[in-house]
């Protein structure tokens, strides 16, 4: 926001919980009041609780599904009239690399993020030719507060890159009307291909690291 303001842009900060109907309505109203219209919606809110499914509470499961899947769908629905009025608008859904390669101890999070990815794909086709494009972003491990309690490193498939790198790639995707932005480099691309062509091999690879991964992510929570 500071960089945008220094560059001459108009910036307005809004504090709201988009996981609630009131928060979504407030966000949209204040954005429209401040900007006079809407050209882009970026669904970037997220929450996670890692761990075995049977050790994850119902409230934690519902919270992840709400903030990672339901809230973006409902906020997009509410924003569509303003986006259509723009004539050339975009919805950007920030999902996760786990939406492409399911990882143990992230079953609900993977389900929510994969659901958001397919929502974006379907909506892109629904809105084709109507002035609203949809971009789906798949970050790899990103150095944000959400990852503070995740102790898994690159040896377990959890590398880190600066949030600024993901932001720059997302901006490039917006400027080029891309369908997808997938982070993680060639290593991630190879794993995606292997998961598609030989999922059993990925199962075996993850089996070998499962004990270490479970220990490393047991406290990973950002809800």
Set out the residue ranges of the language-model regions.
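Conserved NAD(P)H cofactor-binding loop of Rossmann-fold oxidoreductase domains
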Residues: 44-49
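Substrate-binding pocket helix/loop in short-chain dehydrogenase/reductase
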Residues: 52-53, 57-63
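Active-site helix of classical SDR
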Residues: 76, 112
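C-terminal helical subdomain
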Residues: 136, 152-190
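Residue(s) in the substrate-gating loop at a strand-loop-helix junction
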Residues: 96
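The beta1-alpha1 cofactor-binding region of Rossmann-like NAD(H)/NADP(H)-dependent oxidoreductases
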Residues: 15-27, 58
């Amino acid at each position: 926001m500071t960089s945008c303001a220094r560059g001459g842009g108009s910036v307005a900060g809004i504090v709201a919980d988009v996981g609630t109907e009131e928060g979504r309505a407030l966000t949209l109203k204040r954005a429209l009041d401040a900007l006079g219209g809407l050209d882009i919606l970026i669904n970037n809110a997220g929450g996670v609780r890692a761990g075995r499914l049977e050790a994850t509470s119902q409230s934690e499961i519902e919270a992840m599904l709400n903030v990672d899947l339901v809230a973006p769908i409902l906020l997009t629905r509410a924003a569509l009239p303003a986006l259509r009025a723009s004539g050339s608008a975009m919805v950007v859904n920030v999902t996760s690399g786990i939406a492409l390669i399911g990882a143990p101890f992230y079953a609900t999070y993977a389900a929510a993020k994969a659901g958001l990815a397919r929502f974006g794909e379907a909506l892109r086709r629904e809105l084709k030719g109507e002035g609203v494009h949809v971009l789906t972003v798949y970050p790899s491990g990103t150095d944000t507060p959400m990852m503070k309690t995740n102790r898994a490193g690159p040896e377990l498939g959890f590398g880190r890159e600066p949030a600024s790198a993901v932001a720059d790639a997302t901006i490039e995707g917006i400027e080029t009307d891309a369908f997808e932005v997938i982070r993680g480099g060639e290593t991630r691309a190879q794993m995606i291909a292997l998961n598609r062509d030989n999922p059993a091999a990925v199962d075996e690879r993850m089996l070998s690291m499962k004990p270490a991964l479970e220990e490393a992510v047991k406290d990973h929570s950002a809800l």
